[in-house]
């Protein structure tokens, strides 16, 4: 009887396992992360607030200056920070912005201001992942300003040693910073803890934008002289790969699982999805004119791409890389930020 019972138990175990193999997984997908998508509408000198679930821009907040290109949202999702850059593009003649607007998202009003004391063309604002400080590129100072968001005081700076330090990425541990220096075509490597420059990585004659892999081991920037993406090893500071693109790349963002890099291909009105395991483009998606910046939602389910010339933001599903919806934004839609709720 004991032997028969053992056979019966073994049979039932296999039967249940086989049934589980055949039965589809009926578990409900994770609900989408709640929050607002913030967009810098350069043409109206205002920050747009998009409700992603409704698929529309529900408000605009005047920034009070000419003009914000990028946005940072506070970790608690209550406040937005918009550096006021000026009326020109990077390296071009024009006005030199000297302040950053602070916007309360609940009241949708400007509630604070950071004055840099002179025209510095403040551009990209990034929260430190560990220290809670707000870091802002100040191009004309060849530096990154360190701001305490609680007091709105400038408490330090990190020199980049290069002109046109336009965009900033910070490693997940908060120890290293990397700036994309457009005109020189270089990347500055920064010691964020000791607030000093560690070196410069030459990439091309001109580059745009910068992003890191989720583990901080790879740096990505788009060559502006050839349709290719530079992949740089952050430890050796050497170019590891050049990935061909269907046009000149621009903004990039990695998915939270570390598998994909989403690349705006500005000159081709497309988005390229790079497989980071194979280091090659796996998907190409048509989007409206002049895709600029890419933001992957924290839950990884959606990628948002601002499209400057078309007043649109494309929402792209990461499950099948299809365009979920096109959201009407403002003219010159550029910088993006996610304000979680």
Go through each PLM region and give its residues.
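Predominantly soluble domains enriched in secretory-pathway, periplasmic, or organellar proteins
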Residues: 12-341
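Positively charged n-region of N-terminal signal peptides that target proteins for export
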Residues: 1-8
């Amino acid at each position: 009887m004991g032997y028969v019972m053992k056979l019966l138990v073994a049979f039932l175990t296999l039967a249940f396992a086989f049934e589980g193999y055949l039965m589809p997984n009926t578990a409900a997908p994770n609900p989408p992360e709640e929050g607002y998508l913030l967009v810098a509408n350069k043409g109206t000198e205002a920050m747009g607030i998009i409700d992603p679930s409704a698929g529309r821009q529900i408000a605009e907040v005047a920034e009070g200056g000419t003009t914000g290109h990028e946005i940072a949202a506070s970790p608690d999702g209550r406040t937005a920070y918009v550096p006021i850059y000026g009326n020109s593009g990077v390296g071009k003649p024009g006005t030199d912005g000297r302040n950053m607007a602070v916007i309360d998202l609940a009241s949708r009003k400007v509630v604070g201001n950071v004055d840099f004391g002179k025209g510095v063309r403040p551009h990209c604002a990034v929260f430190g992942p560990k220290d809670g400080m707000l870091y802002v590129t100040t191009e004309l100072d060849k530096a990154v300003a360190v701001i305490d968001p609680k007091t709105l005081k400038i408490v330090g700076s990190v020199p980049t040693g290069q002109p046109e330090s336009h965009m900033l990425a910070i490693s997940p541990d908060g120890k290293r910073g990397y700036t994309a220096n457009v005109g020189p075509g270089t990347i500055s490597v920064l010691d964020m803890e000791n607030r000093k420059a560690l070196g410069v990585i030459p990439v091309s004659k001109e580059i745009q934008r910068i992003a890191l892999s989720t583990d901080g081991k790879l740096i990505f920037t788009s060559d502006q002289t050839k349709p290719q993406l530079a992949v740089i090893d952050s430890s050796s500071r050497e170019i590891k790969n050049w990935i061909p693109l269907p046009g000149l790349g621009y903004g990039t963002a990695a998915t939270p699982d570390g598998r994909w890099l989403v690349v705006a291909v500005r000159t081709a009105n497309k988005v390229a999805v790079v497989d980071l395991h194979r280091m090659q483009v796996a998907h190409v998606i048509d989007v409206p004119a002049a895709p600029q910046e890419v933001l992957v939602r924290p839950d990884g389910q959606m990628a948002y791409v601002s499209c400057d010339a078309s007043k649109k933001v494309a929402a792209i599903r990461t499950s099948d890389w299809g365009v979920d919806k096109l959201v009407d934004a403002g003219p010159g839609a550029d910088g993006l930020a996610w304000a979680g709720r």
